[in-house]
Amino acid sequence: MKPSKSHHKEKTARRREEKLEESDNPKYRDRAKERRENQNPDYDPSELSSFHAVAPPGAVDIRAADALKISIENSKYLGGDVEHTHLVKGLDYALLNKVRSEIVKKPDGEDGDGGKTSAPKEDQRVTFRTIAAKSVYQWIVKPQTIIKSNEMFLPGRMTFVYDMEGGYTHDIPTTLYRSKADCPVPEEFVTVNVDGSVLDRIAKIMSYLRLGSSGKVLKKKKKEKDGKGKMSTIANDYDEDDNKSKIENGSSVNISDREVLPPPPPLPPGINHLDLSTKQEEPPVARTDDDDIFVGEGVDYTVPGKDVTQSPISEDMEESPRDKEKVSYFDEPAYGPVQEKVPYFAEPAYGPVQPSAGQEWQDMSAYGAMQTQGLAPGYPGEWQEYQYAEQTGYQEQYLQPGMEGYEVQPETDVLLDPQLMSQEEKDRGLGSVFKRDDQRLQQLRESDAREKDPTFVSESYSECYPGYQEYNHEIVGSDEEPDLSKMDMGGKAKGGLHRWDFETEEEWEKYNEQKEAMPKAAFQFGVKMQDGRKTRKQNRDRDQKLNNELHQINKILTRKKMEKEGGDVASLDAAEAQTPKRSKH
C-alpha cells in the first residue's frame, strides 16, 4: 500500500514541473510556417540513424536517401510516435503496447535513480488489515486453497433423531454423528488433463472407422501383418467347422441376435458343434509401435466373420436399429425343438397339401430361388396381351373370350399361393383391381364435367375461406337480385345511417356493433370470367333460351301429330301468327 502513495506524490510533483515549463514556452506554434521552411524542432537528425532502411544495391543517390529520410519522418505522424500522431490512441495496437511499456518502465527507472529497489510483483506478499478483506481475497482470487471437504458432513455420517413419544414432537431434533469408519467410502473424483496430441490421434482413429463403414480399406500398419495372418487362420478354421456342422446337421442354421431361446439341452455325443474354447489360444501380441497410443497392451481379438477384409461397423453407425429386429422367415433356433412357424404363403384351402417341415426339410434358400424362377417367366407372361392404358374405359374389354364375367372375391384370412390358383381365380383378383381403377376414373370424369360448367366454383381453396361455398351457391343459384346491404361501401357510402339519425350515444354504439360489413370483393367473386365480364343475368337468359327451344320442339311434334291424324294445320299456323313475338332490347 505504501509504494502506491509514494508513486502518487511523485506523479503530482512531475505534473507541477511540466506546468512550469509550459508557462515559459509559447502556448501555440505556427506549424504551417515550420513546414514551409522545412523546419521541425521536435525531431533531431540524430534520431533518424535508429531507422535501418534497406537501401538499393549499388551507388545510392543523395537525393534518394533524403527522400527516404523524409518518408520515415512523415510516417511518424501516422502512429509511429506517441506525442505526434493522427490516430486515436487505443486503435493502434502497436502504439498502445508501446505506451504501456513506457508507463511500466518510468516508475522503475525513477526509483533506480533515487537508490530505491522495488521487489518484483511475484515476490511481493499481499498484506491485509482486516479479516474480511483476507477472506474475500481468498474466496475470489485463490478459492482452491480454502475449499476443503468437511469430514463431519460425509454422506451418511450426520443424522437427526426426532423424539415422537412423550409429547416432544415439536422439540428440536437431536444430532447423531456416526463413526467415520461406519460411513460409506465417498467416491473420489480425479481430474485428468489429456494431452492434445492424444485427442488428435483418437479423432483420426474415429475418422478411419467412419470411412471404413462406407467400404474403404482401413490403413494397416506394417507391424500388424503378423496379427492379420493369425486372424486369417482363425477365420479359416471357423469356416471349416461351420461347413462341417452344416453337412452333419443337414440344415442351414441362422442365429438371430434378438431371438430369445431356452437354455440349451446337453449336446449329443455324435454331433460336432462350433466350439472355439477347445482351440489353442494364441498368446497376445504386445504393441511396440512408437506411434501407437496403447503401447504395451495385449491384442485381444474377437472371432471375425467370414469376410475378414470387411471394415468394422459400430453400433451407432448402422443404417437402422430395426434391421436387427427383422427375423428371416427361415430362421430357427440353433438348439432345442424346432418351433412351428407359419410360412410366407400359408397352406392353400384347396389343392395338394405341402409336406410339413419334419417330413421333408430342405434348404429354404434353394426353395425361394426355385419359386422365383417358376413365377418370373410364367405368371406375368399370361397377362402381356393386356394394355391397361387403353382398357380403363370399359369393363367389358378386360374379359377374355372364354370368360363370362368376374366378381370381387371376398377377403379371406388365408393367403393363396399363385402356383396353386386356377386361371379363373386369378381373373377374379385381377378384375377387382380393374374395377377399383374404373371407380377412380369415373370420379375424375365427373369432376371434369362439373368444371366445364361456367357457374362451377372449384373447392380447392375452400379451406382458406370456411363457409364461403354455401354463400356462393346461394348467390349463384337464386334468380333474385343479390342483397347488397351487407357490402362494405367504404367511407363515402350513401344511404347509410349516421350519428345524427340516433338520439343517444348508446343507440349509435349498439347500431355499430350489430352492423355487418363484408368486403366488396366477396360480392364480385365469379363475376369476371375469361371471356369478358358476365353478370348473373346470364343464368336467367340461359333458362329462357332453353324454354324457347323446348316450346319450338313441342310445336313441331304437335304439327307432325296433326298431319298424321289429318287435323287442321292451317288453324295452328294462324294461332302462331297471332302470338306477338318478343323483341330484344
UniProtKB/Swiss-Prot annotation:
<feature type="repeat" description="R-[ED] 7">
    <location>
        <begin position="445"/>
        <end position="446"/>
    </location>
</feature>
<keyword id="KW-0597">Phosphoprotein</keyword>
<feature type="repeat" description="R-[ED] 2">
    <location>
        <begin position="29"/>
        <end position="30"/>
    </location>
</feature>
<feature type="region of interest" description="Disordered">
    <location>
        <begin position="219"/>
        <end position="324"/>
    </location>
</feature>
<feature type="repeat" description="R-[ED] 8">
    <location>
        <begin position="450"/>
        <end position="451"/>
    </location>
</feature>
<dbReference type="InterPro" id="IPR039896">
    <property type="entry name" value="Red-like"/>
</dbReference>
<dbReference type="GO" id="GO:0016607">
    <property type="term" value="C:nuclear speck"/>
</dbReference>
<feature type="region of interest" description="Disordered">
    <location>
        <begin position="1"/>
        <end position="52"/>
    </location>
</feature>
<feature type="compositionally biased region" description="Basic and acidic residues">
    <location>
        <begin position="530"/>
        <end position="548"/>
    </location>
</feature>
<dbReference type="GO" id="GO:0005634">
    <property type="term" value="C:nucleus"/>
</dbReference>
<comment type="similarity">
    <text>Belongs to the RED family.</text>
</comment>
<protein>
    <recommendedName>
        <fullName>Suppressor of mec-8 and unc-52 protein homolog 2</fullName>
    </recommendedName>
</protein>
<dbReference type="Pfam" id="PF07807">
    <property type="entry name" value="RED_C"/>
</dbReference>
<feature type="repeat" description="R-[ED] 5">
    <location>
        <begin position="322"/>
        <end position="323"/>
    </location>
</feature>
<feature type="repeat" description="R-[ED] 9">
    <location>
        <begin position="540"/>
        <end position="541"/>
    </location>
</feature>
<dbReference type="Pfam" id="PF07808">
    <property type="entry name" value="RED_N"/>
</dbReference>
<feature type="modified residue" description="Phosphothreonine">
    <location>
        <position position="579"/>
    </location>
</feature>
<keyword id="KW-0677">Repeat</keyword>
<dbReference type="GO" id="GO:0008380">
    <property type="term" value="P:RNA splicing"/>
</dbReference>
<feature type="compositionally biased region" description="Basic and acidic residues">
    <location>
        <begin position="15"/>
        <end position="39"/>
    </location>
</feature>
<dbReference type="InterPro" id="IPR012492">
    <property type="entry name" value="RED_C"/>
</dbReference>
<feature type="compositionally biased region" description="Basic and acidic residues">
    <location>
        <begin position="276"/>
        <end position="288"/>
    </location>
</feature>
<dbReference type="InterPro" id="IPR012916">
    <property type="entry name" value="RED_N"/>
</dbReference>
<comment type="function">
    <text>Auxiliary spliceosomal protein involved in splicing of specific pre-mRNAs that affect multiple aspects of development.</text>
</comment>
<keyword id="KW-0539">Nucleus</keyword>
<feature type="region of interest" description="Disordered">
    <location>
        <begin position="523"/>
        <end position="585"/>
    </location>
</feature>
<feature type="repeat" description="R-[ED] 3">
    <location>
        <begin position="36"/>
        <end position="37"/>
    </location>
</feature>
<comment type="subunit">
    <text>Component of the spliceosome. Interacts with SMU1.</text>
</comment>
<feature type="repeat" description="R-[ED] 4">
    <location>
        <begin position="258"/>
        <end position="259"/>
    </location>
</feature>
<feature type="repeat" description="R-[ED] 6">
    <location>
        <begin position="436"/>
        <end position="437"/>
    </location>
</feature>
<feature type="repeat" description="R-[ED] 10">
    <location>
        <begin position="542"/>
        <end position="543"/>
    </location>
</feature>
<feature type="compositionally biased region" description="Basic residues">
    <location>
        <begin position="1"/>
        <end position="14"/>
    </location>
</feature>
<feature type="repeat" description="R-[ED] 1">
    <location>
        <begin position="16"/>
        <end position="17"/>
    </location>
</feature>
